[in-house]
Amino acid sequence: SNRPMPLNLYQFKNMIQCTVPSRSWQDFADYGCYCGKGGSGTPVDDLDRCCQVHDNCYNEAENISGCRPYFKTYSYECTQGTLTCKGDNNACAASVCDCDRLAAICFAGAPYNDANYNIDLKARCN
């Protein structure tokens, strides 16, 4: 699909490129049951668990009045692989930034299993 990427996902993609420069962010866009479109069932591995935690983190952020995590931009910086959320973020932006920052760090520490890329969600993620 060639729909424009929501702005926040553009920032999240850049965060992933900061912590995992050796991989394309697209490797994380369709992985396991939770990375990308999915969001049900049992995570297939540690990396998928990172995405489940990220999904739950966004759900928590939605409890902040008017906060829409997928569209919320925030201010952050990447310095030599270290991500910092900046102090000028409002409550929503700060929460979403931290969700993305923690997920990008989690991705960097989790093994990547090629067999879990683009799996059959219906069969594996009930």
From Swiss-Prot:
Pro-piece positions: 1-7
Binding positions for Ca(2+) per the UniProt entry: 34, 36, 38, 55
Disulfide-linked positions: 18-78, 33-125, 35-51, 50-106, 57-99, 67-92, 85-97
Alphabetic keyword roster: Calcium, Disulfide bond, Hydrolase, Lipid degradation, Lipid metabolism, Metal-binding, Secreted
Catalyses which reaction(s): a 1,2-diacyl-sn-glycero-3-phosphocholine + H2O = a 1-acyl-sn-glycero-3-phosphocholine + a fatty acid + H(+)
Domain of life: Eukaryota
Subcellular location(s) per record: Secreted
Gene Ontology cellular component terms for the protein in this record: extracellular region
InterPro entries: PLipase_A2, PLipase_A2_Asp_AS, PLipase_A2_dom, PLipase_A2_dom_sf, PLipase_A2_His_AS
Organism per entry: Naja sagittifera (Andaman cobra)
Full protein name: Acidic phospholipase A2 3
Tissues in which the UniProt entry reports expression: Expressed by the venom gland.
Function, in words: PLA2 catalyzes the calcium-dependent hydrolysis of the 2-acyl groups in 3-sn-phosphoglycerides.
Gene Ontology terms for molecular function: calcium ion binding; calcium-dependent phospholipase A2 activity; phospholipid binding; signaling receptor binding
SMART domains, per the entry: PA2c (SM00085)
Names of required cofactors: Ca(2+)
GO biological process, one term: arachidonate secretion
